[in-house]
Amino acid sequence: MKLEDIARELGLTELTPKVTGNSEADIERGYASDLLSDVLAHAPAGGVLVTLQVHLNVIAVASHAELAAVIFASDRRPDDEVCGKANAEGVSLFVSPADTFDVVGRLYALGVKGNHA
């Protein structure tokens, strides 16, 4: 499913409108974790990350893991510095009012699978 369709279906708020190309990315896999070493080891390239972490290291990890997007659950919002870094690195950022469990469940219902599905 296209990232822009996921954002629309989940009612996500986009924080990085300057990132181009990702909205058309076909998202097949996702990962949820707040432990960044776990994300580095297991998140699927081209996928989405669902997390509560909102600091700069999330962007570094997302970029290194070649993630298309990060969804911040529970209405958690990074500051402007984090959004600026994401724009520079080409990582799309979104916010959901739903908690992590609900975001992941809705992603799965839309056809986004985990690494072992």
What are these regions (language model features)?
Residues 30:
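The Walker A/P-loop phosphate-binding site
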Residues 23-24, 33-48, 52-117:
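Feature captures the catalytic cores and cofactor-binding loops of soluble hydro-lyases/lyases
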Residues 1-22:
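N-terminal, charge-rich interaction modules
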